[in-house]
Amino acid sequence: MLTQKTKDIVKATAPVLAQHGYAIIQHFYKRMFQAHPELKNIFNMAHQERGEQQQALARAVYAYAANIENPESLSAVLKDIAHKHASLGVRPEQYPIVGEHLLASIKEVLGDAATDEIISAWAQAYGNLADILAGMESELYERSEERAGGWAGWRRFIVREKNPESDVITSFVLEPADGGPVADFEPGQYTSVAVQVPKLGYQQIRQYSLSDSPNGRSYRISVKREDGGLGTPGYVSSLLHDEINVGDELKLAAPYGNFYIDVSATTPIVLISGGVGLTPMVSMLKKALQTPPRKVVFVHGARNSAVHAMRDRLKEASRTYPDFKLFIFYDEPLPTDIEGRDYDFAGLVDVEKVKDSILLDDADYYICGPVPFMRMQHDKLLGLGITEARIHYEVFGPDLFAE
């Protein structure tokens, strides 16, 4: 339990840390990786190079400090972090390592301004946060291991199918190498895939949505190729596209994530996606259309038909289920793409153009796609009168969505 004095010191110094936050976090990662290079196996090094992980951690530290009197207000954020950590295999013994280098970085960047009293207060605050997260993650590991077909840590899977979905998205159907069943998951959850990157000399982990409904035998992930070279974003996705084939092995974590629909509800849902953001939506859609039927509206944006994954199966579903409406936006339609046949609207996704179809009583709204896309859709939904509590979103990688 933190004393009031500790809370007061943390709150009073939070603005100073926010001002120097990026420099502190940059210093922290450099310091920690020099002392513990094995942690590069957990962290996304592409996000490191772009500075996104540094920004996200700096923002998280400040948010925790600013809300230290009312940590319950961060419960949803902490839950998301715990799910992400569980998917990465973060262990309790790694928290002291992070704490040691974070506190040392605060001292080394701020110098004499970071007094012993300030460092002590932040050490207590960090310890409290670490205990909360480690406890949440322990529960997630136990739950994953105890359920039928579940496991904790990494499990070897065999690629049984590799199917191109578009020019840039490929689906992989994966079955356990041990021949056992796989755990069910909530529609919208993700798994982590761990691959060894020989040229880097360490493992890299990426999260991919499970893009099919649970079947107890296999998982399907749909991966967008993010073109890039060594050490840049997209290296892992390119490796999966180019080097992983049927019969090869991949290591998977159990399903995690808080972005999913309530399968017991019958109220309407509106799915809004951009690009590869449709992958969790497809899983949600398949489950929602099962008995009892519920109203579903799917609004999707892509550049054109060449990169529009799973187009035919979505169109088929819209013809089959009377309670399902599909709206497609192409912002760069090909000459062969015909409005009214291949897509409904030219341009970027604009929910105002379909507001008569998406403004439904008691509906929940799910957004997935690039961060700027999600921010735009989120703000437009608020402008249409949708409450914040009804809007849900998924961010893979550092969460740069919330300001």
Curated annotation (Swiss-Prot):
Marked site, Involved in heme-bound ligand stabilization and O-O bond activation, at: 29
What's an example Gene Ontology biological process for this entry? Answer: response to toxic substance
Cofactor names from the entry are:
heme b; FAD
The record lists FAD as bound by 190, 206-209, 395-398
Name the top EC class: oxidoreductase
Q: Which cysteines are joined by disulfide bonds?
A: none
- Which residues are in the FAD-binding FR-type domain? 152-262
Give binding positions for NADP(+). Answer: 275-280
What keywords is this UniProt entry annotated with? Answer: Detoxification, FAD, Flavoprotein, Heme, Iron, Metal-binding, NAD, NADP, Oxidoreductase, Oxygen transport, Plasmid, Transport
Please state what the protein is called.
Flavohemoprotein
